[in-house]
Amino acid sequence: MYIDAVDLAKFYSTGLGQVTRRLIRRKIRTIWSNTNGLTILGFGYATPFLRPFLTEADNVMALMPAQQGGTYWPVDGLNRVVISEDDELPFQDSSIDRLIVVHSMECTEHLRPMLKEIWRILRGDGRLIIVVPSRSGVWARTDRTPFGFGQPYSSSQLTRLLRDGMFLSLIHI
């Protein structure tokens, strides 16, 4: 079951949420240091992590699952959020260069169809980052943060899911 987008926005407006956003953004930027000319999609509730790409990528969008609801983003510009079913993504085949999944994979009831759709829209040389609660992590054991909801994953579970979905797993952080 998805966490409501309004509740996620409230979390990321708190002190803990702001620290979380900074730490995750830093990791993402380490992996994706150059996104000039690329099309980037944030899937789930990924908007807290997309702002740095607005000035360099050709296109930055956010897709929020209908079950999660949506919020306007960015607050200081034209809306870049699309709402869709998580297993029927409204994008052409091979149209996304970089895709980040946050607050979605652990909540969906359609995991394998969702991964199949991500595979379909991601370019052959595209890159995917998945942010999920760690099965061994402290945050997966408390419901004080959004990372305490849904299905946590171990590294081996993620590797197996991605391999079964025809993805090549390169990095675990």
Question: Residue ranges of each PLM-predicted region?
Answer:
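Class I SAM-dependent methyltransferase SAM/SAH-binding core
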Residues: N34-E88
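A short SAM/SAH-binding and catalytic strip from SAM-dependent methyltransferases
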Residues: D97-H110
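Short, glycine-/aromatic-enriched active-site segment of Class I SAM-dependent methyltransferases
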Residues: V132-G150
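Class I SAM-dependent methyltransferase Rossmann-like catalytic core
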Residues: M1-S33
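A short glycine-rich, Lys/Arg-flanked "PGG" loop and its adjoining helix->strand segment in the class I
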Residues: R112-R127
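Short glycine-enriched, charge-decorated loop/helix-capping segments at active-site entrances
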Residues: T14, G77-L78, R144-G148
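A short acidic, Gly/Pro-enriched loop at the edge of an enzyme's catalytic core
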Residues: D87-L99
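Conserved small/polar residues in nucleotide/adenosyl-binding loops
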Residues: I171-I173
